[in-house]
Amino acid sequence: MYAVFQSGGKQHRVSEGQTVRLEKLDIATGETVEFAEVLMIANGEEVKIGVPFVDGGVIKAEVVAHGRGEKVKIVKFRRRKHYRKQHGHRQWFTDVKITGISA
């Protein structure tokens, strides 16, 4: 059984027991969260596709950890003009473990 849900402007394909890295959620570590924006649920040959969301579809997950991703360097450069700027960015993320999928 697997499902596709939407969180943080992105779509994720998950199954029970899987750990997924999402955009930062303001929920403490160890707490549970429910995702109601379920786009599709598949159980063997039975597939439910939402328009846009599956009615009654809920994905339950437990927050495992929060953190920051790898650093991305941004460089602004003009040749022959002695001009260079560097900037870095580290995106916040939340790791969640999927505990249940229901339709």
Swiss-Prot record:
<dbReference type="GO" id="GO:0005840">
    <property type="term" value="C:ribosome"/>
</dbReference>
<protein>
    <recommendedName>
        <fullName>Large ribosomal subunit protein bL21</fullName>
    </recommendedName>
</protein>
<comment type="similarity">
    <text>Belongs to the bacterial ribosomal protein bL21 family.</text>
</comment>
<keyword id="KW-0694">RNA-binding</keyword>
<comment type="function">
    <text>This protein binds to 23S rRNA in the presence of protein L20.</text>
</comment>
<dbReference type="InterPro" id="IPR028909">
    <property type="entry name" value="bL21-like"/>
</dbReference>
<dbReference type="GO" id="GO:0006412">
    <property type="term" value="P:translation"/>
</dbReference>
<keyword id="KW-0687">Ribonucleoprotein</keyword>
<dbReference type="GO" id="GO:0019843">
    <property type="term" value="F:rRNA binding"/>
</dbReference>
<dbReference type="GO" id="GO:0003735">
    <property type="term" value="F:structural constituent of ribosome"/>
</dbReference>
<dbReference type="Pfam" id="PF00829">
    <property type="entry name" value="Ribosomal_L21p"/>
</dbReference>
<keyword id="KW-0689">Ribosomal protein</keyword>
<comment type="subunit">
    <text>Part of the 50S ribosomal subunit. Contacts protein L20.</text>
</comment>
<dbReference type="InterPro" id="IPR001787">
    <property type="entry name" value="Ribosomal_bL21"/>
</dbReference>
<dbReference type="InterPro" id="IPR018258">
    <property type="entry name" value="Ribosomal_bL21_CS"/>
</dbReference>
<dbReference type="GO" id="GO:0005737">
    <property type="term" value="C:cytoplasm"/>
</dbReference>
<keyword id="KW-0699">rRNA-binding</keyword>
<dbReference type="GO" id="GO:1990904">
    <property type="term" value="C:ribonucleoprotein complex"/>
</dbReference>
<dbReference type="InterPro" id="IPR036164">
    <property type="entry name" value="bL21-like_sf"/>
</dbReference>
